[in-house]
Amino acid sequence: MWGCWLGLLLLLLAGQAALEARRSRWRRELAPGLHLRGIRDAGGRYCQEQDMCCRGRADECALPYLGATCYCDLFCNRTVSDCCPDFWDFCLGIPPPFPPVQGCMHGGRIYPVFGTYWDNCNRCTCHEGGHWECDQEPCLVDPDMIKAINRGNYGWQAGNHSAFWGMTLDEGIRYRLGTIRPSSTVMNMNEIYTVLGQGEVLPTAFEASEKWPNLIHEPLDQGNCAGSWAFSTAAVASDRVSIHSLGHMTPILSPQNLLSCDTHHQQGCRGGRLDGAWWFLRRRGVVSDNCYPFSGREQNEASPTPRCMMHSRAMGRGKRQATSRCPNGQVDSNDIYQVTPAYRLGSDEKEIMKELMENGPVQALMEVHEDFFLYQRGIYSHTPVSQGRPEQYRRHGTHSVKITGWGEETLPDGRTIKYWTAANSWGPWWGERGHFRIVRGTNECDIETFVLGVWGRVGMEDMGHH
């Protein structure tokens, strides 16, 4: 009984296999020719690359060809041809019977010879014979890297940020960072050590915006201006002035004022130093972002930094008064805001935490790697997904950000990860509404190496005036 059923089952499977084979043969016989409009990729090495020439009909003697299938068997050389472009020359030693396409096919349209299209950050150019040649630059948005990060157990998720699409990794490093690493003299400046009181315990989580509501400002967007030195400095100073004035002054300070006017050893949208930025804020001061708005997100090393449009004079006791009207003609208030000298904190996480909790957000230098641009959410740490790739895929540069808090999170695998919360200067569309979390206590990306604090210059007359 079971033998009969087994025989019937095998017979049925054999019949289905034969039917599928016939359908495959019919599909090939009924398919339109590949070269009705001429041979695309006429210089392509298909049969030759595989050293493949088959007699008669051999459906397995096939290769992928521009989204279709081409063959290297004699059967392909019939009225309706589905031969690979080099079949006639390589297998038969004769010229092909079809002319090469004068142009290249992409996305359903034909491009003329020397026509171009962009594939992410790489330009592809059509050459004679119908084949494309594309640049091989590493792109800032790397879909393969996104997949590798999200498959791994790294504690954070990567994503495609449309504002970065079409940029090379080199352009991201050149235009989206912009803090020049301090000189050895500055890096060796004395640290101010913060001592925890006996029995003092810091909370497991803290966020500046919760302690000082309405006094912590949201991230701005530096665009393709390599000016993180100005944006992070203005961001920390804005919060510190707001906190130290007890909310009597709550300016969003102008990065453009620094970019255009702080020109001593600074390079505007081509990069700058933090010590120079804090010197300018202490000695000259800046106005609000409303008064002197950012000129545009497309400033870069190829465009000159706009000239300085704010000037001031000394009033005595180190204070400054503006002598220029606001570049934004719709704003009347041209008040100058200043700070005291910046000071460096120790690299111990508890010292940074205590300073942040008592006096407000701090500024941190960090090394940005190729995967950081793709950050979407979670607790960031630099991943090894680019190891083993050529050097041009493994780039890094110096950046500066504003640290606003800290916390801990238990991951699905049971690990507890400590983190900093920081504000970037790439706009609210990036990361966690413009912010990111990064592993705390291990000096991840050197973020605990060079941390600065500052006091807003606030007097009683300022409190009354504002």
UniProtKB/Swiss-Prot annotation:
Tissue specificity as recorded in UniProt: Highly expressed in kidney, heart and adrenocortical cells of adrenal glands. Moderately expressed in spleen and liver. Also found in prostate, seminal vesicle, epididymis and testis in male reproductive organs. In adrenal glands is found in the outer cortical regions corresponding to the zona glomerulosa (zG) and the undifferentiated cell zone (zU) (at protein level).
The protein's matches in CDD domains, at most eight in alphabetical order, are given as: Peptidase_C1A_CathepsinB
- The record's account of how the chain is modified after translation: Glycosylated.
What upregulates or represses it?
Down-regulated in prostate after castration.
Q: Where found, per UniProt?
A: Secreted
Disulphide bonds annotated for this chain are 53-72, 70-72, 70-84, 76-83, 84-91
- GO CC, alphabetical: collagen-containing extracellular matrix; cytoplasm; extracellular space
The protein here is known as Tubulointerstitial nephritis antigen-like
Where does this protein come from, organism-wise?
A: Mus musculus (Mouse)
Question: What is the gene called?
Answer: Tinagl1
